[in-house]
Amino acid sequence: ILDEIADDMVLLEKQGIRFALDGFGTGYSSLPQLQKLPITRLKLNKSYVQKVTADKDSASVVRAMIYMAHGLELTVVGEGVETEEQKAFLVKNRCDHLQGFFYSEPLTFDGFAKLLNSEGTTARRAYLSVVDK
């Protein structure tokens, strides 16, 4: 069934749709999927990200996943960033994008629009415009 899904994804990719493998390292996400599916972005599961500063084995695993993803020409997103230390670790290890409560709690559309229009969010707007391109 994975081959059938991959074929459908390739057709969608040709129409400009891009795919991310979410929660990499847990559940059904696996190494064979990285090779078979036409994904452009790998999202590291927050269960790994949240342990990088407290557990050296988790830190080693995350470093290896980032390195491997870049070797496959994938963009890497670190999910679940909650602390400055986690952010610093991921930035130091060349994680391309970060997301989590460190930046913002989940927002409604109206709350997001209000955040973008509030004072002091120039850096956030600049970051979002870069990420969105």
Predicted regions: what is each one?
Residues 8:
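Conserved functional hotspot residues or short segments at active or partner-binding sites
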Residues 1-3, 13-133:
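EAL-family c-di-GMP phosphodiesterase catalytic domain
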